Amino acid sequence: MPGSPPPENAPAVLWTCFGASGWRMLLMKQRRNEMKVLDLDCFDRKLPLICDLDGTLIKSDSLHENLFDAFFHSPQQLLRTIPNWFKGRPALKEALAKVRSVEPQALPYREQMLDLIRRARSAGRETYLVTAADQSIADDIISHLGGFDGAKGSSGSLNLKSRRKLQWLQESFPEGFIYAGDSAADLPIWEAASGAVLVGDGVKFESKLREAGVEVRTLSPEKSHPVKDWLSELRIHQWSKNVLIFVPLFLGRIADDFHAVLKTTFGFLAFGLIVSATYIINDLADLEADRAHATKRFRAIAAGRISVMNGFLACLVMLATGIGTALLLDHQFALVASVYLALTLAYSFRLKRVALLDVTVIGALFTLRIVMGQVLNGLAFSPWLFSFSVMFFISLALAKRHVEAMRACSNRKDTIEGRGYLPGDWPLTLGHGLASASASIVIMLLFLALEPRVTHLYHNPAWLYVAPLGVSIWLQRIWLLSHRMELHDDPIVFALNDKTSWFIGALIASAFVMAM
């Protein structure tokens, strides 16, 4: 009522500002927030807290992680498990766990669930991990985390899931239990439990369980940004490097041909899908290492925001769409794109750890983008452009390696993680990088001086000499920043965010326009 005194628990200022109805709304919001903290004090402390693993204690699925880990790191041993695939899920889980056991310290745990378990333990409540994952995985996890009174997983012919899990729980805890789970398979268990904790996707069953008379508590869902996560996972920002596919259109003076531009645009999109698929493959293969990395652990798959299975399925769809579109556009284009895919995978799994060969491969990968633009439009192969591109991008790749070597040296590290270089190799990366940069400039100058087609294609070719001058200044700047350890990004990414680079690029573009 207006003018009525505030309740004892209502601050006078809030009561004045919001009134009785506003205060009730604030109280309801506060209670909802309190429920999000999740308090189990309403349940008898004699009731143990039973926690599921996949999707509940961790954000991912341990079976899928085990499968992909074995596929990328122990493929031969994975093939030996094929007979177990026909013996049921428990046999498959056991066989995979023997091939490559999941590293418990690398799993994406739900912090809210860990906090709930800690608070339950401090309140004197027993806690158990009961999962359909293999028993060895359950044992490893509770050994790593601590805070559990025991663990039970699948073994032999027993797949501890849904009603089989319920049967085991009722036999082991006849006086009742509180169950924390996340999926439809947990419904029979929740309905028979003394209390239900809904986690992740399990929150959608809240109303159904309340109608069934089950005492329900929910963990507040973490803020999700699926579109942002997928754009980040697909590295859409890296598609900027694929703009090189348009370079032959401008150098071949066919940028005003609508059909050529349209065809190249479709090629750009198809190739972008293939490139994004390779990033997903790389993330799936390096999952354990990424989770141990200071920044890579925040990637969508590593953090569990995108499941490994969804990542794999997206990869298959993008590869099929990208290669299929490439085949429709031009068979030679599809062939070059396939070579790029094979070379990228070889680089990701092995070649990036081989000193000097790694930067040569990077130079080749960038050059293949230009080759795609040539074959897609039936343009003649240019050894000048090919040679310049290889040397130019080898220099940029070495600039990145140089920064890594310099930083490792200044931090007095003995090795550079994931690379074939040592900190003391920085004079080598500096020398080779500057030599490659100089070679690219010399190639450009020789092309302008000796290639007859220059005078045929351009009315004022003298303006073109601005290009090697601008590229030379830009490369010198890149190497200066690299040696000072001020180059914090990939040189291409750096250029896209650098005003000086844009100015030099605009100057070179203007020179080409004047030359026409």
From Swiss-Prot:
Compartments, as annotated in UniProt: Cell membrane
Main location: membrane
Organism: Sinorhizobium fredii (strain NBRC 101917 / NGR234)
UniProt keyword annotations, A-Z: Cell membrane, Membrane, Nodulation, Plasmid, Transmembrane, Transmembrane helix, Transport
Transmembrane segments: 183-203, 261-281, 308-328, 329-349, 356-376, 379-399, 430-450, 461-481, 492-512
Functional note: Possible permease/transporter.
Membrane association type: Multi-pass membrane protein
One of the protein's GO biological processes: glycolipid biosynthetic process
Gene Ontology terms for molecular function: transferase activity, transferring alkyl or aryl (other than methyl) groups
Gene3D superfamilies named in the record: HAD superfamily/HAD-like, UbiA prenyltransferase
InterPro entries: HAD-like_sf, HAD_sf, Prenyltransferase, UbiA_prenyltransferase, UbiA_sf
Protein name per the record: Uncharacterized protein y4nM
This protein's GO CC annotations: plasma membrane
Organism lineage: Bacteria, Pseudomonadati, Pseudomonadota, Alphaproteobacteria, Hyphomicrobiales
